[in-house]
């Protein structure tokens, strides 16, 4: 567990905590207008990120015993650099708790996990219209990628 200040704890998500996290995962998915949000599917999908995991890790931020945010990382690779990277695929802070440094603390905790794995870098993306997130990301010292992403529906 990583204690940030006197009141914010960030730790890997455990099986019992996953249940408490499901509504927040659904809120994150709703923010990005995901279709067909179902707790059972989310439970099965995100269970694979509980430590120890070969695919990634979920961490959660707690303040006074209350869940206030989470991040989900995927172990990733860069073939152009022949290195391991970490993809922070999800970062979400409860709407009522935004602007309190929780998102920044979660990013820093993800960076710590990535460093601990010997990863070359931590990477993430957001939508072009999520200006609030972009302001946070721009303030972390991270550089905007020059890559353009594509998605092919299957």
Listing of model-derived features with the role each one plays in the protein:
Residues 93, 99-112, 139:
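Conserved acetyl-CoA-binding loop-helix of GNAT-fold acetyltransferases
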Residues 9-23:
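A short beta-loop-alpha structural element at the N-terminal edge
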Residues 115-126:
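Conserved GNAT acetyl-CoA-binding A-motif
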Residues 89, 94, 127:
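Residue-level recognition of the GNAT/N-acetyltransferase active site
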Residues 77-88, 98, 145:
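A conserved beta-turn-beta hairpin within the catalytic core of GNAT-like acetyltransferases
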Residues 60, 66-75:
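Conserved beta-strand in the GNAT
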Residues 26-48:
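Conserved GNAT-fold acetyl-CoA-binding loop/helix
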Residues 48-60, 87:
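A short helix-loop-beta-strand connector motif used in the catalytic cores of GNAT acetyltransferases and
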């Amino acid at each position: 567990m990583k204690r940030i200040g006197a009141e914010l704890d960030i730790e890997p998500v455990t099986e019992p905590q996953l249940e408490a996290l499901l509504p927040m995962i659904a809120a994150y998915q709703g923010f990005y207008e995901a279709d067909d949000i179902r707790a059972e599917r989310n439970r099965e999908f995100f269970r694979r990120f509980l430590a120890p995991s070969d695919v990634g890790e979920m961490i959660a931020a707690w303040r006074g015993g209350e869940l206030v945010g989470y991040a989900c990382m995927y172990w990733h690779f860069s073939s152009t650099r022949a290195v391991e990277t970490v993809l922070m695929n999800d970062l979400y802070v409860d709407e009522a708790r935004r602007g309190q440094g929780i998102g920044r603390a979660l990013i820093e905790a993800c960076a710590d996990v990535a460093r601990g794995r010997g990863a070359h870098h931590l990477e993430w993306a957001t939508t072009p219209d999520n200006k609030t997130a972009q302001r946070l990301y721009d303030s972390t010292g991270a550089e905007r990628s020059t890559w353009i992403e594509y998605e092919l529906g299957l």
